[in-house]
Amino acid sequence: MAVAGSWQPPRPCEVYRAEWELCRSVGHVLHHYYVHGKRPDCRQWLRDLTNCREWEESRSAEAQRSLCESEQVRVQAAQKHTLVWALRQRPPTDWNLPLPQEKDK
């Protein structure tokens, strides 16, 4: 178990600020609207930035807990997507045969 005073936020506060600014940028908003049909919700990045700064200033246990929960949710959301391609256990048996030659005429 780590020493109680040695905990650091999962990311530096500058990263939360950069992610929040990127989320609010015109290019990102347009891309997100094109792909998902709605504006991105940047409130979680702002909450994380606020909690990170609060933890740096006052070592708030509530801010620490909130940051940890937010990162866990973010990691779980990234892992829940299924693979597009089915992974093979071994290559096809005819992988080394020459390719068929198409006749142009």
UniProtKB/Swiss-Prot annotation:
Tissue distribution: In the postnatal brain, expressed diffusely throughout the hippocampus at a low level at 8 weeks (at protein level). At 16 weeks, strongly expressed in the stratum lucidum of the hippocampus (at protein level). In developing and aging brain, expression is strongest in hippocampus, especially in areas CA3 and CA2, throughout the dorsoventral axis.
Signal peptide: none
Xref: InterPro entries: Pants/Emi1-like (IPR021475)
Primary location group: other
GO cellular-component term (any): synaptic cleft
Location of the protein in the cell: Synapse; Synaptic cleft
Highest taxon of the lineage: Eukaryota
Keyword Oxidoreductase: no
Modification after translation (UniProt): Rapidly degraded by proteolysis following neuronal stimulation, resulting in increased AMPA receptor clustering.
UniProt record, GO biological process: negative regulation of long-term synaptic potentiation; regulation of synaptic plasticity
Keywords on record: Secreted, Synapse
Matches recorded under Pfam families: PANTS-like
Coiled-coil segments: none
Keyword Lipid biosynthesis assigned: no
Family affiliation: Belongs to the UPF0545 family.
General function of this protein: Negatively regulates long-term potentiation and modulates adult synaptic plasticity. Stabilizes the interaction of RTN4 isoform A/Nogo-A with its receptors, inhibiting clustering of postsynaptic AMPA receptors at synaptic sites. Upon neuronal stimulation, degraded at synapses, reducing RTN4 signaling and allowing AMPA receptor clustering at individual synapses.
Subunit structure: Interacts with RTN4 isoform A/Nogo-A; the interaction results in enhanced RTN4-mediated inhibition of AMPA receptor clustering. Also interacts with NCAM1, RANBP2 and CCT8.
Annotated protein name in UniProt: Synaptic plasticity regulator PANTS
